[in-house]
């Protein structure tokens, strides 16, 4: 049986919107619209991606596991779906939307009244195969942390040359991660 602590999961998930709001709101666009190069995300794009996941990924997949198990695979996730959804919106609008959607999703998650055995329930991912609800929820948290790190890395990238020789001591500039397709 999975040893999943839902309180620990929701504690972090609940903080991500405020973390991003504190980091990004009211910054000059050079910080939020600049990326790391061709085919990479800006902080604005990452936020749009997180919103798209709130709408189409985490809770819909949790519901699918609970309702259908492995008999009905998850819908594929459109990694670029955020481009349509973010078009014409401002960063403050995206920050507000992310906060609202995350709050709604966490409320929905709480109303499921999950029991310990529910975390072992299985669903089918279109690329990864069989996954458990526990794995999905742990991935949701880790996905948030990945993108908080990514936003920090994107922003640090703006000063990659300016820091001069100190770059060797700044791990965020040495990170092998990238924003392009995996």
Feature locations, PLM:
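Amphipathic, non-membrane alpha-helical segments in soluble helical-bundle scaffolds
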Residues: 3-14, 40, 44, 91-95, ...
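Acidic/histidine-rich alpha-helical segments that form the ligand environment
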Residues: 16, 79-121, 131, 135-143, ...
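Short acidic/polar alpha-helix capping motifs at helix-coil junctions
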Residues: 9-12, 25-26, 69, 86-88, ...
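Charged/polar positions within long, soluble alpha-helices
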Residues: 22-25, 29, 63, 67, ...
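Short, contiguous alpha-helical
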Residues: 32-77, 120-182
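Alpha-helical bundle segments that constitute or directly flank the non-heme di-iron/ferroxidase center
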Residues: 2-31, 51-64
């Amino acid at each position: 049986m999975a040893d999943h602590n839902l309180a620990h999961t929701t504690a972090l998930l609940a903080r991500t919107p405020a973390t991003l709001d504190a980091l990004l709101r009211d910054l000059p666009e050079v910080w939020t619209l600049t990326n790391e190069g061709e085919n990479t995300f800006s902080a604005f794009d990452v936020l749009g991606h997180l919103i798209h996941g709130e709408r189409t990924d985490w809770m819909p997949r949790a519901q699918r596991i609970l309702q259908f198990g492995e008999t009905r695979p998850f819908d594929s996730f459109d990694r670029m779906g955020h481009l349509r959804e973010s078009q014409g919106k401002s960063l403050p609008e995206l920050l507000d939307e992310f906060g609202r959607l995350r709050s709604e999703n966490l409320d929905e998650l709480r109303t499921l009244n999950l029991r310990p055995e529910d975390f072992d329930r299985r669903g089918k991912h279109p690329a990864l195969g069989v996954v458990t609800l526990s794995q999905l929820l742990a991935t949701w948290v880790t996905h948030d942390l990945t993108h908080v790190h990514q936003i920090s890395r994107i922003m640090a990238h703006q000063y990659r040359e300016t820091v001069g020789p100190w770059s060797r001591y700044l791990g965020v500039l040495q990170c092998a991660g990238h924003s392009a397709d995996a």
